[in-house]
Amino acid sequence: MNPNQKLFALSGVAIALSVLNLLIGISNVGLNVSLHLKGAGTKQEENLTCTTITQNNTTVVENTYVNNTTIITKEPEFRAPSYLLLNKSLCNVEGWVVVAKDNAIRFGESEQIIVTREPYVSCDPSGCKMYALHQGTTIRNKHSNGTIHDRTAFRGLISTHLGTPPTVSNSDFICVGWSSTSCHDGIGRMTICVQGNNDNATATVYYNRRLTTTIKTWARNILRTQESECVCHNGTCAVVMTDGSASSQAYTKVMYFHKGLVIKEEPLKGSAKHIEECSCYGHNQKITCVCRDNWQGANRPIIEIDMTTLEHTSRYVCTGVLTDTSRPGDKPSGDCSNPITGSPGAPGVKGFGFLNGDNTWLGRTISPRSRSGFEMLKIPNAGTDPNSKIVERQEIVDNNNWSGYSGSFIDYWDDGNECYNPCFYVELIRGRPEEAKYVWWTSNSLIALCGSPFPVGSGSFPDGAQIQYFS
């Protein structure tokens, strides 16, 4: 074959390949157009799937090399909001790791940090936030004098990104009040704030930031609620509220809400003698609340709510390992039905536990007399066995540093787990009354921890502020 014939042959092959490449490109364009027309012709209001087609055509005539690549990728489906269903069990936990620490008091030495107390954590489909009751002032403001008082007209609920100390510029105002709870049902958030006079208080209920109803005091003695997140199942949210004496008989109700409206309420049933400041978590279509008996018990009362029947019962954590503060020494055997008394006893502190059979964990201050230090105790079957004992201990805050309230929370929208990973927070109170020598204010920082399925190391995570810097 002479050179001219070779040239014609190569040119013919190149032209053929180019035509083939052109036909493939035309077919890809046709496919793309047909897919888009099909998507446009079908109206889907909830679940939409986007298809992206990337075409790369390369032709080199001289070397007769053709590269034709078509990549079809599916973007993740958009899921319409739906009600949370408590259809998982709690995850097993081998130890606890810190996931957030806001260092609010340390920042407050030079920054305009808001004075708060009663903080907690609550999650929704987009993530988790810190909620707290502010005192209408910043730490360095002269109005911080006297913020040891729990109930004033200047308090209100705010939220910030978890781990971010609250300032005037980054805090989101929620509602006015000196007691609160908040939870997300998967579609919207319900929030309750209690405001007004001690003997004539009102609870205001909001759903998606809009006022939906109000609840007036029923015992005229400091109507109050959980000071941590409530929990929802299939659109119904359960909240524990108490009205009455903090040191004798009080009147507790379990209330059920749908979109911020009361659909049912039950007076306290079961053997618990006094209920305050419940820390609640959901699992297996149930809600378990570990609460505070401010009247008699150094053991914690619990409320168990069946969210399929909207009914509850109450009793006490069975173990003889006592977790309220103040408390007497641990007992060889506990009591599932009655408060365990002893000196020192009342008044108490908000606390929590995760009652999960062999993987039960309870939290408590290290000091039996004051709100200092914090530890997590693994006590298998503590919720059901009076003779259950501590098998593992993890220190969270050493006993040379102040702690405070603590409570539970769970990110129910963590799709990476086939179970609900337990989490909790600890309030780190600074100022009065323990540090009245240095300052006139009372405020807090916060740490949040979540369970690890693997063994963890050790560490103490105190507030860390040098209080004398504020003198």
UniProtKB/Swiss-Prot annotation:
What Pfam families is this protein classified in? Neur
Q: Which residues lie on this side of the membrane: Virion surface?
A: 28-471
Control of this protein's activity: Inhibited by the neuraminidase inhibitors zanamivir (Relenza) and oseltamivir (Tamiflu). These drugs interfere with the release of progeny virus from infected cells and are effective against all influenza strains. Resistance to neuraminidase inhibitors is quite rare.
Catalyses which reaction? Hydrolysis of alpha-(2->3)-, alpha-(2->6)-, alpha-(2->8)- glycosidic linkages of terminal sialic acid residues in oligosaccharides, glycoproteins, glycolipids, colominic acid and synthetic substrates
Annotated segments matching region Head of neuraminidase? 90-471
Q: Where are the transmembrane segments?
A: 7-27
Q: How does it sit in the membrane?
A: Single-pass type II membrane protein
- Residue intervals annotated with topology Intravirion: 1-6
After translation, the protein is modified as follows: N-glycosylated.
Kindly list the GO molecular function terms attached to this UniProt entry. Answer: exo-alpha-sialidase activity; metal ion binding
Q: What is its main location?
A: virion
**Family per UniProt?**
Belongs to the glycosyl hydrolase 34 family.
Q: What is known of its domains?
A: Intact N-terminus is essential for virion morphogenesis. Possesses two apical sorting signals, one in the ectodomain, which is likely to be a glycan, and the other in the transmembrane domain. The transmembrane domain also plays a role in lipid raft association.
- In its UniProt entry, what is this protein called? Neuraminidase
Originating organism = Influenza A virus (strain A/Chicken/Victoria/1/1985 H7N7)
